[in-house]
Design a protein with these regions (language model features):
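Terminal low-complexity "docking" segments
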Residues: 1-106, 120-134, 138-139
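Short, hydrophobic/amphipathic alpha-helical patches that form generic packing surfaces
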Residues: 110-121
């Protein structure tokens, strides 16, 4: 397991453990944690691929900007359209974000930002910067 992939797996498990402790009534989060822990033993890259597909690809800009409205809207749509191991984490944005304490929101933003950075690193993606996200034309020969 690559260092970046290993760090990503450790961090996402810690995130889910924190969510289980914070929202013990949410059975889906506990089941998500168990699925991720099992996948880490068998195929850790699967966890990375799920996060990339269901969180990073469409929501990393919301996370980087701490855009509550964008992420809550995305999470609601994702949870309602396609349930998977990442859905249980997105569920907190759908069900609990509005009533959550600022300290919990801050902790979740920090986890999500770190997970996005580790995901990009493990996937070999360029860090997102304004110049990297803006299309440029290459000069014609």
């Amino acid at each position: 397991m690559s260092t970046a992939l290993g760090a990503f797996c450790v961090q996402i498990i810690r995130f889910f453990e924190e969510l289980v402790d914070t929202f013990p009534e949410e059975r889906d989060i506990k089941l998500g944690l168990e699925a991720i822990q099992g996948a880490r033993k068998i195929n850790p890259k699967l966890i990375l691929d799920l996060f990339y597909e269901h969180v990073y690809r469409d929501a990393h800009e919301f996370i980087e900007q701490e855009n509550d409205d964008g992420l809550v809207t995305y999470a609601k749509a994702k949870v309602n359209s396609q349930f998977n191991e990442m859905s249980s984490a997105l569920l907190i944005f759908d069900k609990h974000w509005e009533t959550m304490a600022d300290s919990n929101r801050s902790a979740i933003w920090k986890y999500m930002k770190v997970l996005c950075v580790l995901c990009a690193k493990a996937k070999g993606l360029a860090p997102l910067t304004p110049s990297a996200s803006t299309p440029t034309q290459t000069p014609k020969a």
